[in-house]
A protein has these predicted regions:
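Short amphipathic alpha-helix with an adjacent loop that forms part of the alpha/beta core around
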Residues: 256-266
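Adenosine-phosphate binding glycine-rich loop
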Residues: 297-368
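Segments forming oxygen-rich coordination pockets for charged ligands
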Residues: 1-236, 240-247, 265-269, 310, ...
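ADP-ribose/adenylate-binding Rossmann-like module
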Residues: 269, 274-277, 281, 285-310
Length: 368
């Protein structure tokens, strides 16, 4: 199932004229399945998009959504699992979850969802700002809007005439600074002109580039699709990267030496797995000028050294996390196991903003 906000909005945009309701977690105390800022949509027939729990709250939320749609009033709902004697909703997380339910109306410009959908479709990131209005107040008084980030993740480093040109090392430092700032973005309450707002960080789905469209790339693309990521497979060879083998991916048949940097700067991660030294060399050369957060090269260490030698590159020439041999040592040798190990590492690097191998220990912890 697709649960990324953009996937929800894609489905909503097919029938925006229906009477929908939006539910958002405004705060959490203790443990919960989803955190503050998680969004879910309900249509008048009971169809749901997204999830706010592991399934224990959705049936009751559907009832509140129907009531909100009929009355056009805002509802604030609290689910308290801290009381072990209260088995009303069979919550197992032991936390307290506060949720706001709001009907989407023409009067509230559908809480700015059309603009939010457009911005995420374009690959932009920023904050979705929702006013926190009182319980039972009219939904027409609500507001929601998208606010773009000041610095895009993949902005190129173009020095002005008044500044010294950026060296490779200084560009790398700026990239890390920007990603650290991005990593600090969390859902929070803000007060503007006396009005409380919920500010939710939003971004397009992660974009994975797979360089090499062989059989072992198929499970990599399939797992990434399950994560709701965007996928592009790069392979100019006629017998590789066939669209029916990669139904969830975009296929790019442009030769690697002819790829434009702009085609690659929108990627968040790249896995190089052509099983061909020259093609892997060309892929690394194409990726080196970018600020991609995660790059993995399939194959053992001695093969990595050969590819680096052909490309006249080293690991230090890449600004993001470079993994070679690719992935975590999870065990297994089949393509699906290799894909799992690579995407597990990639997922951790992207979500935890890990910049070097020494920081991988941050992945070895229990989820909280």
């Amino acid at each position: 199932m697709a649960h990324h906000l953009l996937s929800l909005l894609d489905s909503w945009a097919e029938k925006p004229q229906l009477e929908w309701a939006l539910a958002v977690i405004t705060s959490v105390e203790g443990s919960s399945y989803r955190k503050a800022g998680a969004i879910m949509l309900f249509d008048p027939l009971g169809k749901t998009l997204g999830m706010l729990s592991g399934g224990c709250l959705e049936a009751d939320l559907r009832r509140h959504a129907q009531d909100a749609i009929q009355t056009q009033r805002i509802a604030h709902i609290t689910y308290d699992a801290t009381d072990e004697n209260d088995t009303s909703y069979q919550l197992g997380c032991g936390g307290l979850v506060n949720i706001m339910m709001v009907p989407l109306l023409a009067d509230n410009q559908y809480l700015g969802l059309p603009e939010l959908h457009q911005q995420l479709t374009r690959g932009n990131q920023g904050h979705y700002q929702l006013s926190l209005n009182d319980h039972k107040s009219h939904a027409g008084e609500m507001s929601g809007k998208f606010i773009a980030s000041n610095a895009a993740k993949h902005d190129s480093f173009e020095p002005s005439s008044k500044t010294q040109p950026l060296t490779k090392q200084s560009a790398k430092q700026v990239t890390k600074q920007l990603t650290k700032q991005s990593a600090k973005q969390i859902t929070k309450r803000v007060v503007l002109d006396g009005q409380d707002y919920l500010s939710v960080p939003v971004r397009a789905p992660y974009h994975l580039g797979i360089f090499g469209g062989g059989l072992d790339a198929q499970p990599l693309a399939a797992i990434a699709a399950e994560l709701d990521w965007k996928i592009t497979v790069f392979d100019s060879r006629s017998a590789y990267a066939r669209s029916y083998d990669f139904p969830a991916a975009k296929i790019n048949k442009t030769p690697l030496t002819q790829l434009k940097t702009e085609e690659l700067t929108q990627l968040d991660a790249a896995v190089v797995m052509n099983h061909n030294l020259d093609l892997d060399c060309d892929a690394l050369k194409a990726l080196q000028p970018t600020n991609i957060d995660y790059i993995a090269l399939l194959g053992p260490g001695h093969r990595r050294d050969k590819v680096f030698g052909l490309a006249e590159l080293t690991e230090q020439d890449f600004s993001g996390f470079f993994s070679a041999p690719a992935g975590l040592a999870l065990g297994g040798e089949l393509p699906s196991s290799v894909a799992l190990s690579i995407l597990s590492q990639c997922h951790g690097v992207l979500h935890h903003r890990i910049g070097k191998q020494a920081e991988l220990s941050r992945l070895d912890k229990v989820m909280s």
